[in-house]
Amino acid sequence: MNSGTLIFVRKGDFCIIKSEDVYYMNVLFPNFYRNSHFDVSKDFLLDIREFIERREFDKLSLIAEDIRKNYENYKDKEVEEVEIVKKELI
């Protein structure tokens, strides 16, 4: 299991976890399973460094929305759950 530092949270949408030199996006999927009221979060390894360095969090929100709408297109970037070991919000 990978682990990292929580660096950004947009409640009800996504969070960003940094592990060494890579960034993971943890995306919240409301009602992921059909006929279920449970929310599920999934982690994705994405090339989002530039967005983070430029503080373009609205663009990251659009990426999270696209992941939810087109989950099948992102399955190859999905990783095992990333454990958050500390919190250093930017």
Residue map of PLM features:
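Extended, alpha-helix-rich binding/interface surfaces that flank or overlap catalytic cores
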Residues: 1-90
